[in-house]
């Protein structure tokens, strides 16, 4: 049976977890909902996928080659909320205690790290599962590379799994052709312009028939509707640039070793201490400790020592008595008579 590597898109999953769960803080006021949601997703998939290797890729603050090509790239994004921003280094600290490698690299995005390592892992004989909330990664799907897209809600996490054939079934195009679709329709979240007036349905129809933006342009007189034809002709260079921006690199030079991603003991002593500090009680079960509820003991009746003779007199008259042990969580807390 082939080894399997699971690659996680760090910022994407944190962001999805942050907006999918209500705000949580520990006693010190640290926000923890994104960290908890991230761990819930990761640990669920570790149980389901049973990977032998695991790593997480994060974006960096520096501009990437995409920003150099197009200054407005991601220019419309709102700043990260402070409550989420403070959880990024916290999440990295948690992963470090679990001995899960983190990869970041200046000049490229986490997507490019995932694309490069995913391709190299597939070529090395691994089965690959890439976890991200970003549908752009569908372009990386193959027969052996599965894209897992979680949707986090208060009621739980729902997952969409995509291999190459699943992308074809959904859009009618191959994962590679999906990039051309993005080039035509653009991407508002990344501020990739695309071609005005061409949305997802029209883009899918054009690429399904012509397979690439370049080939569609060569058959420009055949493109329908007329508005799409005219706009593609006018904004062709913008479409090519948008395709380039949407293309995830799979040939980056990244310093890493698959041996470092081999899963060992995720639930280390350091991880347990940090989980306790963050009060992630629902995850204590992974350390063999159930979440403990507040222990309370209600006193139903009492008597003073002056009445003790009357109690024993009643026992003598009845000829028998029952002695009960009051226990909480396996511990004796008192007696009842």
Regions found by a protein language model. Name each.
Residues 1-101:
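Domain-level signal for Mg2+-assisted phosphodiester chemistry and nucleotide/NA-binding surfaces
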Residues 2, 25-26, 75-251:
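Extended two-metal-dependent nuclease catalytic cores across DNA- and RNA-processing enzymes
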Residues 9, 56, 114, 134, ...:
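A residue-level signal for conserved active-site and pocket-lining positions in enzyme catalytic cores
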Residues 13-15, 62-66, 110, 136-139, ...:
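Short, active-site-adjacent cap segments at secondary-structure transitions
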Residues 17-20, 66-71, 140-145, 151, ...:
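Short acidic, glycine/serine/threonine-rich loops at helix termini
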Residues 46-57, 127-143, 149-150, 234-250, ...:
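Structured, non-catalytic alpha/beta "coupling" segments that mediate domain-domain communication
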Residues 257-337:
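Long, highly charged low-complexity segments
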């Amino acid at each position: 049976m082939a080894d399997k590597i699971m690659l996680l898109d760090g910022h994407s999953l944190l962001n999805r977890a942050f907006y999918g769960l209500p705000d949580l803080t520990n006693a010190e006021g640290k926000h923890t909902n994104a960290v908890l949601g991230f761990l819930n997703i990761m640990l669920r998939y570790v149980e389901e996928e049973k990977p032998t290797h695991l790593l997480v890729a994060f974006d960096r603050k520096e501009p990437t080659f995409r920003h150099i090509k197009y200054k407005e790239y991601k220019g419309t994004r709102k700043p990260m909320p402070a409550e989420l921003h403070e959880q990024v280094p916290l999440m990295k600290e948690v992963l470090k205690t679990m001995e899960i490698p983190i990869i970041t690299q200046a000049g490229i995005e986490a997507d490019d790290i995932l694309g490069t390592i995913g391709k190299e892992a597939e070529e090395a004989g691994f089965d690959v599962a890439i976890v991200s909330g970003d549908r752009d990664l569908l372009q990386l799907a193959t027969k052996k590379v599965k894209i897992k897209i979680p949707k986090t809600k208060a009621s739980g996490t729902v997952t969409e799994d995509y291999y190459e054939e699943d992308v074809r079934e959904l859009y009618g195009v191959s994962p590679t052709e999906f990039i051309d679709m993005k080039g035509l329709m653009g991407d508002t979240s990344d501020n990739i312009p695309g071609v005005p007036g061409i949305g997802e349905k029209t883009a899918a129809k054009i690429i399904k028939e012509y397979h690439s933006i370049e080939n569609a342009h060569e058959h420009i007189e055949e493109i329908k509707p007329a508005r799409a034809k005219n706009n593609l002709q006018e904004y062709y260079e913008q479409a090519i640039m948008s395709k380039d921006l949407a293309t995830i690199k799979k040939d980056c030079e990244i310093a890493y070793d698959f041996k470092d991603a081999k899963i060992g003991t995720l639930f280390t002593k350091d991880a347990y201490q940090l989980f306790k500090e963050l009060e992630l009680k629902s995850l204590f079960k992974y350390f063999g400790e159930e979440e403990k509820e507040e222990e309370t003991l209600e006193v139903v009746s009492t008597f003073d020592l002056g009445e003790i003779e009357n109690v024993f007199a009643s026992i003598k008259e009845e000829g028998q008595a029952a002695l009960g042990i009051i226990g909480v969580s396996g511990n004796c807390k008192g007696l009842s008579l």
